């Protein structure tokens, strides 16, 4: 973009990042690719005293599975016995909040759920060729796997809606020292989601229902990790209370429905 200066370095090479940053100071620093506690420890070393706000991209999959009560709020316990990815995100959050409490490190934690855009369709699972393999099967009238009986609730947020909430948190002093999820208000079952996909392609939906636990076992044998993404995420009933993000960012009002997106 006009007016932007691009600084390039490998974030995993801390010395190279320090050299690239020089004496720069930032209103906001965001890390979308921090996945372990070691990653955020490095970020604290890099951005403490350099950024007025540090935004960590966590995950709504960190919320308790199975969820004890709906809707999910930011105070819902964080515990996911099925997915190491989620447990690592929880460890990152715990470390960052400790740094906030003890040192005033200006962290904001964002927990996205399933976020999509025009280049990425919403499906429950797919093979090595990605979501397009599933869409090709729908278009060809072939069976596609839907976990369980397809009646579990899911939330998929269009990137345009997510961006409104995310940008509204940047430089927002009320967002410091807190965690917030950014999700749409629309909840749909997987049956409804796949029906939308089939309708968009003008094809009939031929659903093959398979138990999520069975998929996890079979996937493991074939070299796929379905246990975390399914049992620890997409196979669980989820519905989010967006009161907090709407309070922090009054302009946040999701507008893109699944059918539109």
Whereabouts are the PLM-identified features?
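Conserved beta-loop-beta element that borders a ligand/cofactor-binding pocket
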Residues: 93-122
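Active-site "gating" loop of Rossmann-like NAD(P)-dependent oxidoreductase/epimerase domains
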Residues: 59-84, 98-103, 120, 126
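Conserved Rossmann-fold cofactor-binding substructure of NAD(P)-dependent oxidoreductases
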Residues: 8-28, 35-42
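Mid/C-terminal beta-alpha module of Rossmann-like enzyme folds, strongest
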Residues: 168-230, 242, 247, 256
């Amino acid at each position: 973009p006009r007016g932007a200066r691009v600084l390039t370095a490998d974030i995993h090479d801390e010395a190279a990042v320090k050299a690239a940053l020089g004496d720069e100071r930032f209103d906001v620093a965001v890390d979308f690719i921090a996945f372990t506690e070691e990653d955020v420890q490095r970020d604290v070393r890099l951005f403490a005293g350099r950024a007025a706000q540090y935004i960590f991209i966590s995950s709504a999959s960190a919320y308790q599975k199975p969820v004890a009560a709906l809707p999910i709020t930011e105070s819902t316990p964080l515990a996911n016995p099925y997915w190491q990815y989620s447990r690592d995100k929880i460890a990152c959050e715990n470390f960052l909040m400790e740094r906030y409490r003890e040192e005033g490190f200006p962290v904001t934690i964002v927990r996205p759920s399933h976020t999509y855009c025009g280049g990425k369709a919403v499906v429950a699972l797919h093979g090595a060729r990605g979501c397009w393999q599933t869409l090709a099967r729908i278009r060809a009238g072939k069976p596609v796997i839907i976990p369980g009986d397809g009646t579990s609730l899911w939330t998929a947020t269009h990137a345009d809606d997510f961006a409104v909430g995310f940008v509204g948190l940047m430089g927002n002093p009320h967002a410091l020292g807190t965690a917030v999820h950014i999700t749409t208000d629309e909840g749909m079952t997987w049956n409804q989601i796949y029906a939308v996909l089939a309708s968009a392609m003008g094809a009939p939906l031929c659903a093959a229902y398979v138990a999520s636990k069975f998929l996890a076992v079979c996937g493991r044998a074939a070299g796929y990790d379905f246990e975390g993404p399914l049992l620890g995420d997409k196979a669980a009933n989820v519905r989010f209370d967006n009161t907090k993000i709407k309070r922090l960012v009054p302009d946040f009002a999701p507008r893109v429905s699944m059918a539109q997106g």
